[in-house]
Design a protein with these regions (language model features):
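P-loop NTPase switch module centered on the Walker A-proximal segment
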Residues: 1-99, 103, 143, 212-215
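A short beta-strand-to-loop transition that corresponds to the Sensor-1 phosphate-sensing loop
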Residues: 101, 127-129, 167-168, 280, ...
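Accessory interaction regions appended to the cores of large information-processing enzymes
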Residues: 159-161, 188-192, 196, 222-606
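Conserved P-loop NTPase nucleotide-binding/switch module
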Residues: 85-99, 104-148
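Canonical P-loop GTPase G-domain recognition
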Residues: 122, 132-192
Length: 606
């Protein structure tokens, strides 16, 4: 008897409540014991995901509901992790599209939804947070319908079932008025509307690996859905990368399946199930595991190419090695190679210089999260400004363009449009919701977006929503898309910052440092109020004499320094600057620390 199975993926924009909803599904299906300690937001398993509330790695969990095993796969909402999305969707038969009852569908959901509709998956729409003040449910459903229509959905896909829910309060309903209850209507909708893909458990084994995991105990772990046949621990199999790949003989060590959030060893698994296997050291994404006598491989999975490149350098500042455990080029190289094991959309290239690595990824977030992870693990390194990856088509250089959607209050619309015009953005659509907010859609080059996030938050006083998604490659736009308007303040000496000196420098610009911070020659300590760089002395104390002052001393009043996040730092720097990243600090510096070296370098580039 084949077991009752359903495989679904959840699509949601950042912060629309996907992970909270999954918590409720796990709780109410009885997957957690009554006395078990529940962690909030179960699916976001690493620290960065919990802090920022974004999902980076596609994760799986499973619930049992009335005898049916439901595999739930989380998809990353961010286009930067598009490499993950496409593979995940190949494992499921339907998608739950989760939209916020106030914000409606956002561009990051658009990316995943487009991929899902193209694969012919039927969506179930879940309107979440229906108890929020300001919920506009009809508008949200109309927006969702229009989005599906724009993305080329079939009539069958446009006839989608709708479930109204509040993940936080743990209820779902088929009517928007409900304010209590449980998740049963959502489970019922899944059982009713998710198709069961026909699969033959008695045919020869075929299993395609769609994502990888790594464990220090058993090595590489492959995750995938069994297309047909059965698999058990200790079984001899063959592995092929695509129909033309070499036939490699291998042996399965363990087979694991998902139950709740746990991975449980099973004696055998059959067609339709999503499983983890280990014991094959060289398993890779897209590999097909087949029965020994019928080595029929499935076509390889394609992953989007990287659009941004950054250089990772060994930290060479005077303060290098004081805070980090891993500082050498070999240690950084080993860590990057380890990352390639499961981060499929990443590329690492050696340059001629052994202290510099060229790392390419799907976007700024993709790369800065890698840097943030390394920093937390005790690495020290320096990173350069991101550059876009150009492609040559018929002798013409093409650069990546993105679709940008911003949602702003009407009063900030002018400033945002002016800034996007300066960055050579092309407006595609503009719609007001009649409640004082306007949604703008632009097509803009990835170069033009570098550094836009922090500028945008300033322009909208933190009230704007923005997100962007890779669209296509197109011929390079002429001229520089964006130059930083201000110069920087550069320290001329090594030492600790002195309050009196910083106070005297306040008229010259905003500071990044506070009194007592360790500084060195060539380090950037603030933003200059004009457009040129200025070398200053922030470690000079007040000259004291033995003549008594007739009045009182002037009181030193300092403006608080700008708090720098890694994203802000990476967006802020220019081509001749680097971000120094250590476990405790983020500092900005010039590539050449000495003034005469900088002058020589700028003469050579002219």
């Amino acid at each position: 008897m084949t077991r009752a199975l359903r495989n679904i993926a959840i699509i949601a924009h950042v912060d629309h409540g996907k992970t909270t909803l999954v918590d409720q599904l796990l709780r109410q299906s009885g997957t957690f014991r009554e006395n078990q300690q529940m962690v909030e937001r179960v699916m976001d398993s690493n620290d960065i995901e919990k802090e920022r509330g974004i999902t980076i790695l596609a994760k799986n969990c499973a619930v049992e509901y009335e005898g049916t095993h439901i595999n739930i796969v989380d998809t990353p909402g961010h286009a930067d992790f598009g490499g993950e999305v496409e593979r995940v969707l190949s494992m499921v038969d339907s998608v739950l599209l989760l939209v916020d009852a106030v914000e409606g569908p956002m561009p990051q959901t658009r990316f995943v939804t487009k991929k899902a509709l193209a694969l012919g998956l039927k969506p179930i729409v879940v309107v979440n947070k229906i108890d929020r003040p300001g919920a506009r449910i009809d508008w949200v459903i109309n927006q969702t319908f229009d989005l599906f229509d724009k993305l080329g959905a079939t009539d069958e896909q446009l006839d989608f079932p709708i479930v109204y829910a509040s993940g936080l309060n743990g209820y779902a309903s088929l009517t928007p008025e409900a304010r209590d209850g449980d998740m049963r209507p959502l489970f019922e909708a899944v059982l009713e509307h998710v198709p069961v893909r026909p699969a033959d458990p008695d045919a020869p084994l075929q299993l395609q690996i769609t994502s990888l995991d790594f464990s220090t105990y058993v090595g590489r772990i492959g995750v995938g859905r069994i297309t047909r046949g059965r698999i058990k621990p200790g079984q001899p199999v063959v592995m092929r990368f695509g129909p033309d790949g070499e036939v490699l003989s291998r042996k399965i060590n363990q087979v694991l399946s998902f139950t709740g959030l746990e991975r449980v060893q099973v004696e055998s698994a059959e067609a339709g199930d999503i499983v983890l296997i280990n014991g094959i050291e060289d398993v890779g994404i897209g590999a097909t595991i087949c029965a020994v006598d019928t080595p029929e491989a499935l076509p390889m999975i394609t992953v989007d190419e990287p659009t941004l490149t950054m250089n990772f350098l060994v930290n060479s500042s005077p303060l290098a090695g004081r805070e980090g455990k891993f500082v050498t080029s070999r240690q950084i190289r080993d860590r990057l190679m380890k990352e390639l094991n499961h981060n499929v959309a990443l590329r690492v290239r050696d340059t001629g210089d052994e202290t510099v690595f060229e790392v390419s990824g799907r976007g700024e977030l993709h790369l800065t999260i890698l840097v943030e992870n390394m920093r937390r693990e005790g690495y020290e390194l320096a990173v350069s400004r991101p550059r876009v990856v150009l492609q040559e088509v018929d002798g013409v250089k093409h650069e990546p363009f993105e679709l940008l959607t911003v949602d702003v209050e009407d009063e900030h619309q002018g400033g945002v449009m002016e800034e996007l015009g300066r960055r050579k953005g092309e407006m595609l659509d503009m719609a007001s919701d009649g409640r004082g907010r306007t949604r703008l859609e632009y097509k803009i080059s990835a170069r033009g977006l570098i550094g836009f996030q922090s500028e945008f938050l300033t322009l909208t006083r933190g009230t704007g929503l923005m997100s962007h998604i890779f669209d296509s490659y197109a011929p390079v736009k002429d001229g520089s898309v964006f130059e930083r308007r201000n110069g920087v303040l550069i320290s001329q000496d090594d030492g600790a910052a002195v309050a009196y000196a910083l106070w005297k420098l306040q008229d010259r610009g905003r500071m990044f440092v506070k009194p007592g911070d360790a500084l060195y020659e060539g380090m950037i300590i603030g933003i200059h109020s004009r457009d040129n760089d200025l070398v200053v002395n922030p470690i000079k104390g007040k000259q004291l004499t033995n003549v008594r002052a007739s009045g009182t001393d002037e009181a030193v009043r300092l403006v608080p320094p700008i708090q720098m996040s890694l994203e802000y730092a990476v967006e802020f720097i220019d081509d001749d600057e680097l971000v120094e990243v250590t476990p405790q600090s983020i500092r900005l510096r010039k590539r050449f620390l000495k003034e005469h070296e900088r002058r020589r370098a700028s003469r050579e580039t002219e």
